[in-house]
């Protein structure tokens, strides 16, 4: 009888343990142990490498985490986050469940959902990081990514919001610029060849398609749910109609598209385009400061709202340096790192921190940032249009390639 009771007790304990939320290993609740394990580790940070200012910022982060924590951070520069996701998928298929080649990944949206659904992410760690106490948890996008709960499997890094900009020396004042996608279509017809967008699946190009879709469909709330193939064609018909109408008056008559945002930015600098856009409110000022765009460039948004979200870092389940990756993720949430990141002299990426959670000195430092001549104030940025469920972007990119891809 005693043996039977012991067995039942053991079974109950196992069931109880299974019912508890998964805890990351190492456990960020024991932060001194995480830092001790991280010292001496090398973290391979897979992140987009298409911006010199972002690359410089990541180099600064690497210097800081090496100096403070003994962690070596190597930036693996990507053109497309899906490349890193594919690596982890291949490693899991090959049974490489430890010592993976990707330790930390800059991610959000459909790539995050894909990794979460396939069990490719480390257990929830983000909300246990010491610097989580500074995060603006009143912003739902720091815990929900494209309508999908993050479950602590990715740590917020920065904010993003679509902003348009133009060279006012050629286009005239931004007050005369289009104020929604219908007006943009009319403007493009009046200025043939002076507008374009990066070809999906480039992130900025795909984001533009979402902006158009949200504005053009009758019921944007449909986009909060996963794609239903039964009504995909009907729901997205207004998007394809808009794209068909604008294509003949795009740059190169829509026969070619900029490869990515840097290529589109260069076309503005070369006076081949008059209006472009980015997913960072400070991008225009940063480009002016870097000498990449003339100082006559100014930003504008659509009064009805533009697309916005949060971007994150996540740790693959088979990372060879999970402790080191946690230390880097935690440093990225520090007031020091977030302050430098928001400064357009370095990057200009909006913070994910709550000003109320910071010390008076840190709040003053954020308030003192010179945001540059082309950066709109928070009050001028207008409403945020929430991201659709990630499954919509996957299907829209596929359909765009069929219709307009080379």
Language-model features: locations:
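Bacterial N-terminal signal peptides that target proteins for export
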Residues: 1-9
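Bacterial N-terminal signal peptides
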Residues: 9-18
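Conserved C-terminal helix/tail region of periplasmic/extracytoplasmic solute-binding proteins
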Residues: 26-30, 266, 373-406
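Short, polar/charged alpha-helical segment
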Residues: 30-39, 46, 51-72, 164
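Extracytoplasmic ligand-binding site segments that recognize negatively charged/polar headgroups
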Residues: 48-60, 76-83, 98, 102-262
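A ligand-binding cleft/hinge motif common to bilobed small-molecule-binding domains
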Residues: 112-114, 276-294
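Periplasmic-binding protein-like
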Residues: 160, 242-246, 257, 281, ...
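Mature extracytoplasmic/periplasmic domains
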Residues: 306-307, 311-380
